[in-house]
From Swiss-Prot:
Organism name: Meiacanthus atrodorsalis
Protein's name according to its UniProt entry: Proenkephalin-A
More about this protein: In contrast to venom of most venomous species, the venom of Meiacanthus fangblennies is relatively painless, when tested on mammals. While species-specific nociceptive effects are possible, this defensive venom is surprisingly multifunctional, being markedly hypotensive (via neuropeptide Y and/ or enkephalins), weakly neurotoxic (unknown components, possibly PLA2s), and perhaps also pro-inflammatory (PLA2s and/or enkephalins).
Signal peptide: 1-25
UniProt-listed GO biological process terms: chemical synaptic transmission; neuropeptide signaling pathway; sensory perception
Disulphide-bonded residues: C27-C50, C31-C54, C34-C66
Amino acid sequence: MAASALSTCLWMLVLGTCVSLVVGTDCGKECALCVYRLLGQQSTLSSLTCSLECDGGLDSQKLRLCQDVLLEEENQSPLASQQDQERVDAMMADEEDATSPEHQMAKKYGGFMKRYGGFMSRRSSASSLEEAGNQDEEQSIRTEILKILNAATEHGGEGDGQEAEAVKRYGGFMRRADRGAAQGNLVEAVLGRVLKKRYGGFMRRVGRPEWLVDSSKKVGVLKENGSELQKRHGGFMD
């Protein structure tokens, strides 16, 4: 019984010695790998293997080198994370640019957009400003024509008493002709001034639009008809 207990104790001592030797060997190996890394050798182990567990197998100088490596990697880790974040932000910005309409146009037309893209954008902005100016000018033309027509209507209302007999006899034909001629002259004057303002000497070289010439001809025909009737019938028309 005592012999079996003694043999058990011996086996435990042997196992403990073997385990301590294995642990010491592993610790020495890790410290050696750490030193090799400090000396510029390539190693797959991280710097965490240079822990303080191996301080007994290293002198103070080598241990200080290991601590410097650990501190340097700890200082570089925030910088590395910041660089990774910047890289991710740059990739996201590139993806957003790739989906933008400008990027699609540049991808579709290639170097043409690079060469003439700025000109096209400036031309589009200038066209929008010109369209806005034309709309304002057209609105002012409408307003002025309405003023002329209202003034002609008021003027015609004042002369209704004097022309009542002529209207009764001739059915208002002469009054409509005279008013149409007067209003046509006023509208033609307004439109002619607007066209001259917009196109300048171009209208003098090319001429007036056909619709404006036709309108003036019609007004002239009405005037000629009125004068011919006046000449033919004399005081009977009065």
